[in-house]
Design a protein with these regions (language model features):
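Alpha-helical coiled-coil oligomerization motifs
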Residues: 24-27, 31, 35-38, 79
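Short acidic DE-rich linear segments
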Residues: 2-3, 77-82
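Short, charge-rich amphipathic interface segments used for partner binding and complex assembly
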Residues: 34-76
Length: 82
């Protein structure tokens, strides 16, 4: 099982990195000088908050990050000595 968990974590990291790139690309179509930090705080940019595509892609990223947190918590619960 640890091998499966490790490969799952690698795939999830790849998905997160891909989605972060995608969210930044969409953000830069709306706010050309947007930075990775800016997309973590979109409320500072009304045009981002109002854009449905940005919110959709950001929601996917949020889901991946939530899954990553859940997997890490489960790993710690299953293996408290790690």
């Amino acid at each position: 099982m640890p091998e499966n968990r490790h490969s799952t974590e690698i795939i999830l990291l790849e998905l997160i990195e891909h989605q972060q790139t995608k969210v930044l690309k969409v953000a830069r179509e709306i706010v050309p000088n947007a930075t990775p930090e800016d997309i973590r705080n979109p409320q500072d940019f009304p045009d981002l908050v109002a854009d449905t595509l940005f919110n959709y892609e950001d929601g996917i990223l949020t889901g991946y990050l939530t899954l990553q947190t859940a997997i890490r918590k489960q790993t710690r619960t299953d293996n408290p000595d790690l």
